[in-house]
């Protein structure tokens, strides 16, 4: 019995791999902390290698998501109804950044496609189009329901509608043509689709 135990232990130990990933000490890691609803205490923590090099407190009320594009960080702040844009430098984020008011839209998720930012919005039930040169919201694409996740396949945008306007569970995915910013089709899928 003792030999079986030792043999099992030996087989187990040689079967383990060292999968510890090395940390690139020149790369920045940005962690968004949502904060408490209604408290405006969402925050960002920036690490370089293993060292925390910057903390940005009180970013807003519910940091929903972050997206990087070129040397910019886009922070979607849901309950503050804004998008914050920071320039990314080797030493962290350049402050104070730019605030883009979304007019009480309750923004959720953001992607960049062809130098324009597309972001989903619960309150306005749409996908807004943000020009990245002027930071002007140039268009709103209406959808039927509360849009959440948004992805691009390189040609089209796909938006998950996971809740209806009455907050009941929805089951559709919307396909958008970013060339003309129009909804092409709506597909019925399972309840509560996500990315």
Label every model-predicted segment.
Residues 1-23:
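Bacterial Sec-dependent N-terminal signal peptides
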Residues 16-195:
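Predominantly soluble domains enriched in secretory-pathway, periplasmic, or organellar proteins
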């Amino acid at each position: 019995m003792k030999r079986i135990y030792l043999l099992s232990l030996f087989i187990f130990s040689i079967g383990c791999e060292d999968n510890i990933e090395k940390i690139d000490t020149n790369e920045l890691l940005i962690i968004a902390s949502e904060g408490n609803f209604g408290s405006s205490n969402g925050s960002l923590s920036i690490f370089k290698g293993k060292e925390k090099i910057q903390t940005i407190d009180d970013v807003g009320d519910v940091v929903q998501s972050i997206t990087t594009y070129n040397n910019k960080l886009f922070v979607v702040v849901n309950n503050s109804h804004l998008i914050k844009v920071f320039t990314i430098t080797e030493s962290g984020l350049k402050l104070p950044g730019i605030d883009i008011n979304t007019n009480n839209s309750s923004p959720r998720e953001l992607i960049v496609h062809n130098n324009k930012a597309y972001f989903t919005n619960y309150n306005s039930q749409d996908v807004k189009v943000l020009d990245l040169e002027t930071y002007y919201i140039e268009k709103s694409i209406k959808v039927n329901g509360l849009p959440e996740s948004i992805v691009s396949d390189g040609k089209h945008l796909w938006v998950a509608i996971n809740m209806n306007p009455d907050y009941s569970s929805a089951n559709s995915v919307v396909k958008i043509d970013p060339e003309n910013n129009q909804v092409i089709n709506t597909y019925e899928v399972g309840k509560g689709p996500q990315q």
